[in-house]
A protein has these predicted regions:
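N-terminal glycine-rich cofactor-binding segment
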Residues: 6-25, 42-74, 91, 111-123
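Glycine-rich beta-strand-centered segment in the early N-terminal region that forms part
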Residues: 24-38, 53-102, 141-143
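Glycine-rich phosphate-binding loop and adjacent beta-alpha segment
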Residues: 210-213, 254-318, 354-359
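Adenosine-nucleotide cofactor-binding segment
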Residues: 174-177, 189-259
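Conserved Rossmann-like nucleotide-cofactor binding loop
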Residues: 41, 180, 204
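NAD(P)H dinucleotide-binding glycine-rich loop of Rossmann-like/cofactor-binding domains
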Residues: 96-175
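C-terminal hydrophobic helical "lid"/dimerization subdomain
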Residues: 1-4, 190, 235, 242, ...
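Hydrophobic/small residue at the entry helix of a nucleotide-binding pocket
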Residues: 157, 180, 188
Length: 359
């Protein structure tokens, strides 16, 4: 039996590097991909720390990792090589959907309620090889760096969130400037947002936001707000004379959710991607801040299959640069260090090389 190495969750909060995992064989309709690079996600941090919110979702023993790119290594039965050529440089949508539920029948595959996710319920990409459905494969441009190819999954979340409602020439608040918030900032800036307010409470996040605005030469189009200061909502409402056109809520924190709603102008849009830790969130002054303003709320989950992927790759091909979001590159053996540093906010994005760093 041919073996490979990979990061396996053995029990909630317990993981280890294994060098004796069976090399996966693609089933009918699947392909096997030799992983070039894979990215550590916030979800991986929650899984590896034993976060109770993941109970009932994860299915150990399972190989972790759902952000990746690589090259097709083997085709399963029934896969047309003309459509999915051997050796192709690809990523993949890791949500394996049912295709028969009401959401899937409406074409909203990303909202499938019986989704299985590779790297969470099914074996994923923190390994030398991974198998996925051929229909989920996304071809990548040959000139796309693997560091970027490895973070397309979260970038897709940011693209889906940011483009949920028109952004060009609009004022935008991004509440929560972690990795996804930073990606939303890149997208909003690239598509022509009039002014962007970056809101956070963490010193490292705020410093990254200021550095990004300076490096991009956006000093007059970006305002960084420390939400620990008095009245962050008033700061935004005053600067915009009534509130932003669009708020993107990425933090998932109850205060962040309320701030996003309160700092949005009448008839504006609030897009929610952040996941609260608690089941229930209280909306303060619900009538005043929400109903009487006639706000529209959008809930975002994952990436639209496959419209978001097409939008994202189009933005990159047109010049949107996200490679600087990757702050650390490591071998698979250093996964524990990578997940710790990412979880502590010391890195904006960590990329792993299961088969060694490509030359």
């Amino acid at each position: 039996m041919t073996l490979m190495k990979g990061i396996q969750l053995t029990a909630p909060g317990q993981f280890r590097l294994r060098r004796d995992l069976p090399l996966p064989e693609p089933k009918k309709g699947e392909v096997r991909i030799r992983v070039a690079a894979s990215g550590i996600c916030g979800t991986d941090v929650h899984i590896c720390s034993g976060d109770p919110s993941m109970n009932g979702i994860i299915a150990p023993p399972v190989v972790l990792g759902h952000e990746f790119c690589g090259h097709i290594d083997k085709l399963g039965d029934g896969v047309d090589e003309k459509k999915v050529p051997l050796g192709s440089y690809v990523s993949a949508e890791m949500h394996e959907v049912c295709y028969v539920c009401p959401a899937c029948r409406d074409g909203a595959f990303h909202a499938c309620q019986t989704t299985k996710i590779r790297g969470i319920n099914l074996d994923g990409a923190f390994a030398e090889f991974v198998c996925v459905s051929a229909s989920n494969v996304v071809p990548l441009p040959a000139n796309l760096p693997v560091q970027v190819g490895a973070i397309l999954d979260p970038l897709g979340n940011a693209v889906h969130t940011t483009l949920k409602t028109p952004i060009k020439d609009r004022t935008v608040a991004i509440v929560g400037y972690g990795p996804i918030g930073a990606m939303c900032g890149e997208v909003a800036s690239f598509v022509g947002a009039k002014h962007i307010f970056l809101v956070d409470v963490a010193d490292r996040a705020l410093e990254r936001a200021r550095t990004w605005a300076k490096v991009r030469g956006l000093g007059d189009k970006v305002t960084v707000i420390d939400a620990r200061t008095p009245n962050p909502v008033d700061q935004v409402v005053s600067a915009t004379k009534g509130g932003v056109d669009v708020s993107l809520e990425i933090s998932g924190h109850p205060i962040g959710i309320n701030n996003a709603i309160a700092m949005t102008r009448a008839a504006g849009n609030v897009v929610h991607l952040g996941l609260p830790k608690a089941d229930n969130v209280t909306i303060e002054r619900f009538s005043k801040n929400f109903i009487f303003k006639g706000l529209t709320l959008h809930a975002v989950i994952g990436r639209e299959m496959f419209r978001t992927w097409e939008q994202m790759l189009d933005l990159i091909q047109k010049g949107m640069d996200v490679h600087e979001l990757v702050s650390a590159e490591m071998g698979l053996d250093d996964f524990g260090t990578g997940v710790d540093r990412f979880g502590q906010g010391l890195e904006s994005k960590v990329v792993l090389y299961p088969n060694g760093k490509p030359r």
